């Protein structure tokens, strides 16, 4: 578990996969209390006589269980379906409608931005993934009353920060580190522009709340 704690402090983790064992249950309980919104998948060669262990996994609110040797072919899909990215995508499902992203290019860009939040997406990199020029992407993304691309990039990253901060185990300094903000003040300024709140209020908003706050009046840069 020490290695897992170090990873959580250093990188954006989308889900935790571990092999439950009776000796780990106490530490797993502490982990779950710190990270109640983090998907945790139990993956082990469970046997018929492991009923008590599986019941303890349920008590510790593991997201799902998979049986090693039986579910091997689908474990990747199981993890993706319960990952933070998938949960965040569902929370932001109304984003295209609320932000007037009606064109195919706008929606394709949105899908990539919701997924790739660990680092600030460069417009050129996004354009390359979409196989268009940087200029075309910047011009077309903001068409039809949609927000400009830079603000939507910030929106998706602030939504992820809000998702992480729903967990008591994530401090603001940790979120700054794992999402590669330059500093705590950089995060605070971005959060203020996008959601008009302090970072300490993000956990209460969650990703959906960030989207709603943004759509209510923060879609355009202030002069």
Question: Where do the model's predicted regions map?
Answer:
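Receiver (REC) domain switch/output surface
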Residues: 53-56, 69-88
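Basic/polar phosphate-binding segments, predominantly the helix-turn-helix DNA-binding elements
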Residues: 123-152, 178-198
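A short, Lys/Arg-enriched amphipathic alpha-helix from helix-turn-helix/homeodomain DNA-binding modules
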Residues: 95-120, 129, 152-170
């Amino acid at each position: 578990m020490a290695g897992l704690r170090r990873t959580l402090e250093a990188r954006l983790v989308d889900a935790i996969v571990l092999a439950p064992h009776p000796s780990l249950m106490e530490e797993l309980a502490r982990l779950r209390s710190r990270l109640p919104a983090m998907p945790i998948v139990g993956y082990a060669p469970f046997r018929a006589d492991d009923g008590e262990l599986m019941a303890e996994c349920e008590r510790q609110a593991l997201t799902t269980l998979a049986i090693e040797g039986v579910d091997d072919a689908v474990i990747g899909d199981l993890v993706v379906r319960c990952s933070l990215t998938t949960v965040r995508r569902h929370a932001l499902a109304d984003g295209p409608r609320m932000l007037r992203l009606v064109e195919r290019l706008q929606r394709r860009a949105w899908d990539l931005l919701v997924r790739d939040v660990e680092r600030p997406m460069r417009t050129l990199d996004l354009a390359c993934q979409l196989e268009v020029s940087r200029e075309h992407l910047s011009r077309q993304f903001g068409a039809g009353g949609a927000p400009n691309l830079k603000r939507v990039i910030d929106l998706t990253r602030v939504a992820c920060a809000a998702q992480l901060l729903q967990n008591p185990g994530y401090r603001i300094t940790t979120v700054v580190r794992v999402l590669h903000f330059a500093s705590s003040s950089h995060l605070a300024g971005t959060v203020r522009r996008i959601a008009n709140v302090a970072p300490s209020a993000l956990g209460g908003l969650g990703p959906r709340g960030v989207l709603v706050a943004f759509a209510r009046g923060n879609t355009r840069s202030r002069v």
